[in-house]
Amino acid sequence: MNWLTNVVRPKIRNILRRETPENLWIKCPDTGQLVFYKDVEQNQFVIPGSNYHMRMGAVARLRAIFDNETWYDVALPEVVADPLKFRDERKYADRIKDARTKTGAHDAVRVGFGKLETSPVVVAVQDFDFMGGSLGMAAGEAIIRGMELAVEKHAPFIMFAASGGARMQEGILSLMQMPRTTVAVQMLREAKLPYIVVLTNPTTGGVTASYAMLGDIHIAEPGALIGFAGARVIEQTIREKLPDGFQRAEYLKEHGMVDMVVHRHDLRPTLARLCRLLTKSPALTVTTAVEAPAEAAAKAEPEATTTEQPGAPAPTEPPAQPAAPQA
């Protein structure tokens, strides 16, 4: 029996584990329902039936927003990886390496430049899977670079926020990104360019105390947690019970903190419409949508395109002369 229990059974278990991928099924946090991962992925990471919005990676976000799933990865400034040589239970440098291996990203923010229903836009996405989307020096530089590019190209800037706050391992250098990004937002305003923020689950801490709540328009995904301090901290401070749904997207909309709550499937057309309205661009008609590729091929100069794929290299610079929105 010892041979059977100690040798044969573990081997059988290992075979079964190898044949079944870990992410084959996803459990809905709202209903507990098990859903096939591919179905959720094809549904933009929205659980069919319950409509629960799962977290979405940066690459998936950019694919869902840009025309033909095509964009240019914007080259971001290099920063010191571990300026304070911080260590808690583990070295901060080791945590950064693990996060980069897990996500394939350099840091928590990725910036892309491309077309949204034929209009040029700059999109920045915070990836919560990278150390909780925390705001550090690299993330701050990425956001500022994205806003500078929006000014250079005279294009709207769209920010997908998802963060637990400032990155504690970088100390005051992390907190400095709050005023720096706030100054960059002012730069967009002086250039009279739209700044649209999409608040996703969760958006908390120093991010909500800076650029995430300074947009011209604030959109929230259904059920997103949005706030500065956690609900338990607030309850302990004020010694009162908070209302149901406090800090959720719907509650914030009812109390005027966000402009609209938009389902993920409706985000792309909503963002395109807002960009057209704020830049006073003509609406995209069926005729122009059909004729645009032929006209572009006839008179436009050759323009490189990139379809982002996991693991595939992508150009790091935007095109020299993108089509500017019509006045």
Curated annotation (Swiss-Prot):
Region of interest: Disordered: 293-327
E.C. numbers: 2.1.3.15
GO molecular function, one term: acetyl-CoA carboxylase activity
InterPro entries in alphabetical order: AcCoA_carboxyl_beta, Acetyl_CoA_COase_Trfase_b_su, ClpP/crotonase-like_dom_sf, COA_CT_N
Organism superkingdom: Bacteria
Compositional bias ranges of the Pro residues kind: 312-327
Pathway: Lipid metabolism; malonyl-CoA biosynthesis; malonyl-CoA from acetyl-CoA: step 1/1
UniProt entry keywords in alphabetical sequence: ATP-binding, Cytoplasm, Fatty acid biosynthesis, Fatty acid metabolism, Lipid biosynthesis, Lipid metabolism, Nucleotide-binding, Transferase
Subcellular location: Cytoplasm
Keyword Lipid metabolism: yes
Pfam families tied to this protein: Carboxyl_trans (PF01039)
Catalytic activity reported: N(6)-carboxybiotinyl-L-lysyl-[protein] + acetyl-CoA = N(6)-biotinyl-L-lysyl-[protein] + malonyl-CoA
Top-rank EC class of the record's enzyme: transferase
GO biological process: fatty acid biosynthetic process; malonyl-CoA biosynthetic process
Record bears the keyword Iron-sulfur: no
Family: Belongs to the AccD/PCCB family.
Subunit text: Acetyl-CoA carboxylase is a heterohexamer composed of biotin carboxyl carrier protein (AccB), biotin carboxylase (AccC) and two subunits each of ACCase subunit alpha (AccA) and ACCase subunit beta (AccD).
Protein function: Component of the acetyl coenzyme A carboxylase (ACC) complex. Biotin carboxylase (BC) catalyzes the carboxylation of biotin on its carrier protein (BCCP) and then the CO(2) group is transferred by the transcarboxylase to acetyl-CoA to form malonyl-CoA.
Name of the featured protein: Acetyl-coenzyme A carboxylase carboxyl transferase subunit beta
